[in-house]
């Protein structure tokens, strides 16, 4: 009778619900862990005056790198190597006008006459090991900025909230989303935080030049400035650069915006020769397919006025979600 069949039907129904929940849950668990409150906490710390503008080779950027490591440990992401830090050295000549520094990663021998000071820098590198330990994908952002210029009247600290505390917050939240998903990715996922970008992409160049598995890196996703409105009337605007030879990168974002109702209106830019003034250039030169999120220029770019209170927080969250979905596919899809 139906009465006797009810428990069986109920069990069947519950099993189906469980199947449905597990089918949707891993990626969506990750997606749900991305929050505006975490975005704000990370950026407000990194772009605070105490961090003195995070100039590469100076105290503020070292504090920033320690902070990033402490969050990776808390999230549960292991270091890529024995340490989370990848130290490297750069050399500088005299202080230039405007307190900017010129840095030469070349051999010190060539520069002996000119070297004014040696700068120690360090990338931060975490990893979630994949099932296929031969292949890697990387998501990264630079954490350094322009430091302090004592010659300026008024505000002398280049806080770099958009450039690039915004990008750092995205990489950290994507790391947490992978852990929160509860599912091991197919490929190794590296979470990279570059030092010395403002001085000539030094950290990412050093990583690419010294990486023993460069030929097994399948893709790199970059953030540089993902927090501002280029035009007030277009709060959802973001430029989405990607390697033209991989048109599926464009399809991924279009599909996910529809599927998850993400509030983004991307300017899709397929690049035949992806270079550009950010760390994606270091990877593109090595022939690695790239994606780069960038919300475009604004009057506070490279000014002491690049403050956290001018950011579009919701946009950063939406970009973080979209790029987590990109990385989920990049780490799990067989081909792209």
Where in the sequence are the language-model features?
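Metal-dependent peptidase/peptidase-like ectodomains
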Residues: 194-295
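Second-shell loop/turn segments in exported
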Residues: 26-33, 49-59, 74, 111-115, ...
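His/Asp/Glu-rich mid-to-C-terminal helical/loop segments that flank catalytic regions of hydrolases
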Residues: 26, 299-336
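Short, small-residue-biased leader/transition segments that mark boundaries at the very start
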Residues: 1-6
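Alpha-helical metal-binding/catalytic segments enriched in His/Glu/Asp
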Residues: 124-126, 139-145, 149-200, 323
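A non-catalytic alpha/beta surface segment that caps or lines the substrate-entry region
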Residues: 54-127
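Acidic/His- and Gly-rich active-site-bordering loop/insert found
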Residues: 46, 72, 114-150
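N-terminal capping segment at the start of a domain
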Residues: 28, 33-63, 75-85, 89, ...
